[in-house]
Amino acid sequence: MNQIPHFDFGGNGEPLHFLHANGYPPECYSGLLEHLKDNYHLFGMKLRPLWDGAKKDDLRDWHPYSEDLLRLLSDREIGPVIGVGHSIGGIVTLRAAMREPKRFRAVILLDPVLFVPSTMNTWNFVRAIGVGEKVHPLIQTAKRRRREFTDLESVFRSYRTKPVFRYMSDESLKQYIEGITKPKSTGGYELVYTPEWETHIYMTGMRDYDLWRGLANFDVPTLIIRGDETDTFMPNAEYLVKKKNQKIQIHTMKKATHILPLEHPKEVADIIKDFLTTESRS
């Protein structure tokens, strides 16, 4: 069986696996990873949209991505890792840690796509009656997303005015733009991550009832970092997590949204390091 596609960012210290979000290739997180590499050896699986020739039509939920992650960890034959994941990356990491907790020293979820069961029920009903693509706002955005660009400087000027990037520095925004694009052989640039894959992942999400069932008995040290302006890991999810497992720590960052690791890379790295240092002493 072929090796799971992954990156190795280098660094010093114990192994830290980082898993990116939907539509955000690993290169988008170079600012965050730079702030972690002095303390940890950083590597990470690439989600299937970034695999050459990967098929999406037979994927009905996100569970296979956790199987991919566990296979990568098994192939590398390393000891317990620190698992860090953003958005879907957090969900994939959490599910993998629930299935094989001995492979994880700690888990850090960056604004995970973990919605309460009532919200998932609504989405699953909408999807079942065939109108999911019409009502999901991120799917509509992905479908309209521009795929090709003449140059990256004009992309930067355009993106700099978008409210979604309001808390990102110029440097982080440029890293993001470089991360989501690649040069075309005929000139110009195109998206690395296709809108078709991005849409498919949105459509097959919010089926995480197993995670809510497993939280009560989950004992891997866990930290959730959320943004106070997020539209993803909502206050009702925070409440339910705390109700099910009081050992899980939750940190809310000010002036931060769902893309907080790109908005505040140094601050997020510092929170991660402080948590892991405290856990190693306990």
Where are the model-predicted features located?
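Conserved HGGG/HGGXW glycine-rich cap/lid loop of the alpha/beta-hydrolase fold
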Residues: 8-55
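The conserved beta1-alpha1 loop
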Residues: 19-21, 86, 226
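Active-site loop/oxyanion-hole signature of alpha/beta-hydrolase fold enzymes
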Residues: 43-84, 123-126, 270
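Conserved hydrolase catalytic core segment
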Residues: 79-123
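Flexible "cap/lid" loop of the alpha/beta hydrolase fold
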Residues: 105-148
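Conserved alpha/beta-hydrolase catalytic His-Asp/Glu region
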Residues: 143-200
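Conserved serine/cysteine hydrolase catalytic core
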Residues: 180-243
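Catalytic histidine-centered segment of alpha/beta-hydrolase-like enzymes
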Residues: 256-265
